[in-house]
């Protein structure tokens, strides 16, 4: 699951972010946004384009960032995620992870409003092309 690899990468490379592979602690999560702590990053996969014969897939990933009542907190994290992932090529995000061919941001951080507690939320979306070998794809 590429979202897990992106979440682990964010936890390692982005200021004030930490990822726990068990999903219990830290503030970076896969497809869930707990009520606390205030500052959270949720990483989710959604749709993508698959080549029927070539061994590559384009996977869409969203990083949704919730900050505090100060909009700059969440924005700064979302912007750092954007800055660090945009344009990344020919690498793996984690050891023994998927081979990333390229990362293309779909947008700069977008303000999606506040949650019920007045905490600002931001999203940034990426299209990530990965090497994806299957039985009929080589």
Region locations from a protein language model:
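Small/polar-rich, solvent-exposed N-terminal microdomains that initiate assembly or binding
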Residues: 1-52, 88-96, 136-138
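Conserved acidic
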Residues: 2, 73, 118
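Acidic-leaning, charged glycine-interspersed low-complexity segments
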Residues: 16, 86-136
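Short, ordered beta-strand-loop transition motifs
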Residues: 34-35, 53, 113-118
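Residue-level signal for secondary-structure boundary sites
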Residues: 51, 71-73, 132-136
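Oligomerization/assembly interface segments of phage tail-like spikes and tubes
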Residues: 55-72, 120-130
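Short intrinsically disordered coil segments
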Residues: 58-62, 79-80, 138
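Mid-chain, well-packed structural core segment of small domains
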Residues: 69-93
